[in-house]
Amino acid sequence: MQERFSAVLLVGAGGFAGASARYLIAVALSSFATGFPMATMLVNVLGCFLIGMISELSLTTSLLPSELRLLLATGFCGGFTTFSSYMYEISALLKDGELFYASLYLIGSLVGGMVFLYLGMALARVWS
């Protein structure tokens, strides 16, 4: 139980730092607003770089213990962007030769995300 609680604290601390970093980047780039979501794109691409580096280092070397991976990959990157997790999971499926599941996850998440975004918006309009 103690180990699980420690893991939750690590993920929470990393998530706080990641979400805060995302907000600060959005604030810093707000003066360059052009209608294009530059901050979101930057965060998503940077998050992919970070989760790729963190995961590779923790899986192939002893440089990052599992606790640090929880803090950085699950916590920080998870709070920073879930897009990085999405891309990493697709790459893991491809690495395992699961082209069908990788494609299903890629397309299903994009299409499903848009469909449910509009469903949520429609439901909110009904309530308002």
From Swiss-Prot:
Keywords: Cell inner membrane, Cell membrane, Ion channel, Ion transport, Membrane, Metal-binding, Sodium, Transmembrane, Transmembrane helix, Transport
GO BP terms, alphabetized: cellular detoxification of fluoride
Record-listed Na(+) binding positions: 78, 81
Description of activity control: Na(+) is not transported, but it plays an essential structural role and its presence is essential for fluoride channel function.
Annotated catalysed reactions: fluoride(in) = fluoride(out)
GO CC term, one of those recorded: plasma membrane
Membrane-spanning parts: 7-27, 34-54, 70-90, 104-124
Database matches in InterPro entries: FluC (IPR003691)
Keyword Magnesium included in the entry's annotation: no
Subcellular location: Cell inner membrane
Coiled coil: none
Bilayer topology term: Multi-pass membrane protein
Molecular-function GO terms, alphabetical: fluoride channel activity; metal ion binding
Pfam families for this protein: CRCB (PF02537)
Family according to the record: Belongs to the fluoride channel Fluc/FEX (TC 1.A.43) family.
Function: Fluoride-specific ion channel. Important for reducing fluoride concentration in the cell, thus reducing its toxicity.
Protein name: Fluoride-specific ion channel FluC
